[in-house]
């Protein structure tokens, strides 16, 4: 028997980058988790739109529905250290703050306790979809996937790969072990029951600095062999990181686009975090390869060494997919609302720096990036991101008032 839910009231969602639709008295029909009816006025609803005795939710004053937020870049093991190390250069921040925290996830009991709180916190913030970096520990990564699955959060979960240029206590023993554990995590995630496909694996090289040639090549082979497998990494995050990458890979002359492409890691399912310092050539390559960008404005303006404002307007002008990321850890907030605010502030700064060429983001555009734009980056735009009929009902029910306030 079909399960039917009806929502009546205020609905807000993006139709495209520039169009944010506010509907005062919408009717949404959800059948077995999918949107099967959407009308903008009560008068438009057919008499036979839903079966009798359907469960109807009439939204009260101060309540509305929005699509669930999509977090395109999130370090789950860094959730306990949000806000620490602000102002440090990126490689110093990793060594002094991040690696010691992530090393604790070698303990599965600790990992389970932290990840339960982490996932619950992001769900409480309305983040119904997240692309998670795990730690380098396979067991902890499986635990994270299990928790996302149990809590009903749509997630991409990846075991972080790092077999060099990290302290011994966190560095993986070899590329072979890293690759084998990654394959085992992929099998585990794809075998979660019941099979609702909410949780998916993602190949996760930390960045080229921490990966040997053998490891990058092996991960690229996985991505090339499976056209459903997503890849995420950091890309042109900060000048210190770019300089270190160029020193390790001099043959690519500073182009991370050429570097990652040479290993088979760039395609339409690639999620590239940050992208703050970009040449026109690299923008052209990402556009041609249809990669997605995870814009992390909070982290980019507080960690890494410098005032790093990604050229989001130029990305959008070129048709490059862009979503927002909390970058939990580097980003001090779990809230996508905070990320939206910071994205708008950063874009205002970018407009000044570009002498008006790169116009600041509007509220409509920032909201799009946090929902439908993020869905595009994760190649989920046909499933979630707005309330189009046929999509899955992935939403946040927002209440802005209390009983006291309504009296």
Regions inferred by a protein language model and the residue ranges of each:
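His/Asp/Glu-enriched, well-ordered alpha-helical/loop segment
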Residues: 262-266, 311-404
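Divalent metal-coordination and catalytic microenvironments
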Residues: 10, 28, 33, 62, ...
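Short acidic/polar active-site loop segments enriched in Thr and Asp
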Residues: 128-129, 229, 321
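Alpha-helical scaffold segments that flank or form the walls of functional sites
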Residues: 82-153, 178-195
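N-terminal metal-binding scaffold of metallo-dependent hydrolase/deaminase domains
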Residues: 1-52
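Metal-coordinating catalytic core of metallo-dependent amide/deamination hydrolases
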Residues: 139, 143-276, 281-283
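Active-site gating loops and adjacent loop-to-helix segments of metal-dependent hydrolytic enzymes
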Residues: 80-113, 164-175, 238-269, 292, ...
